[in-house]
């Protein structure tokens, strides 16, 4: 499967390296796109090494004027995964804001999109964030629920990056539907 992994600004961004590594090792083609905030938590070089592809971090990375990246990645790939999906990213997509490569790719896509929210429990349980998630689900976006556990901030609650097998199970379920 051709999978775009969008990494957004969350402390859990480093956990997506395991996801990219697993997908690549099982034979999937993986393209990583990172928000600017994601690059503050983990280097794009880590994802480039694991995916064996240049990581996209900007709308304006392209060397070829005829290549429109957000359209290419939104149409020519099988699945888009947003892992971790921050509250900021969920809010932007739920409200049609396409102001970076990640949100532009998601909003331009006609392919399945899987969000993997990961954030502080107070953020995750906030009514605004929950309304954005509800809206996205109603629009047909797929989700892997965050786990409950000790978060990076020292609070225990819902918002933890899910276990890899839970994410892979959902990817395979979506992939099976779209064959």
Task: Go through each PLM region and give its residues.
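A cross-family phosphate/adenosyl-ligand binding-site feature
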Residues: 1-114, 120-179
């Amino acid at each position: 499967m051709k999978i775009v992994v969008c990494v957004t600004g969350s402390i859990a961004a480093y956990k997506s390296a395991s996801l990219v590594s697993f997908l690549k090792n099982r034979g999937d083609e993986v393209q990583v796109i990172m928000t600017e905030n994601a690059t503050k938590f983990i280097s794009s070089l880590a994802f480039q090494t694991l995916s064996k592809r240049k990581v996209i971090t900007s709308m304006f990375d392209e060397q070829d004027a005829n290549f429109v990246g957000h359209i290419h990645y939104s149409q020519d790939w099988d699945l888009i995964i947003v892992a971790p999906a921050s509250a900021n990213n969920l809010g932007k997509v739920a409200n049609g804001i396409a102001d970076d490569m990640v949100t532009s790719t998601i909003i331009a896509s006609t392919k399945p999109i899987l969000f993997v929210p990961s954030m502080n429990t107070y953020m995750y349980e906030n009514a605004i964030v929950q309304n954005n998630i509800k809206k996205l689900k109603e629009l047909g976006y797929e989700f892997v629920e965050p786990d409950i556990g000790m978060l990076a901030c020292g609070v225990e609650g819902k918002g933890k990056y899910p276990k890899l097998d839970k994410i892979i199970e959902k990817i395979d379920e979506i992939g099976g539907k779209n064959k």
